[in-house]
Amino acid sequence: ANIGEIDILINNAGYLVKNNFDKLSHEDLLKSYQINVIGIMQAVQVIIPKMNPNGSHIVNISSMGGFQGSVKFPGLTAYSTSKAALCSFTELFAEEYKDSGIKMNCLCLGAVQTEMLEEAFPGFEAPHSPEEMASFIYTFATTQGDFMNGKIIPVSQSTP
């Protein structure tokens, strides 16, 4: 299918394996990084030529687990480090493409009541539903690209 210029791209991919560091398999690490970082980077490579050069915005969805200085949880090494890598990618891309008209920012989400959260933290009740967070992300993506680039932004009332 032929698509026109893209104004907004939201990268929301997540894979979480909960296991102590010494128990993580090679496959656990590969899958975490493939989904949480490499797949996103490859998607961006494909999309760059289609992005609107007169102002477009890429929003990466990371996690408070990958936000420097945040509370860390045992068993989330693969997840949190891969989400931290996504934050670093955001900063590097923003610098490399700063004159292109394409902006990239990263939202580090705290707890949202998803299946992934329930599996990682059974019984934990998050302050936001997926629908509420989707509304926030949409508003951010459509209104903030003109104001910031390369920013890593915590979006959390609680952690996890």
Question: Over which residues does each language-model region extend?
Answer:
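Conserved NAD(P)H cofactor-binding loop of Rossmann-fold oxidoreductase domains
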Residues: N12-V17
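Substrate-binding pocket helix/loop in short-chain dehydrogenase/reductase
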Residues: N20-F21, D28-L30
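C-terminal helical subdomain
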Residues: C106-L107, P122-P160
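Active-site-adjacent segment of SDR/Rossmann-fold oxidoreductases
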Residues: M51, V71, E91-I102
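A short, exposed helix-loop element centered on a Lys and neighboring polar residues
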Residues: V44-Q45, E91
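Residue(s) in the substrate-gating loop at a strand-loop-helix junction
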Residues: S63
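Active-site helix of classical SDR
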Residues: V44, Y79-S82
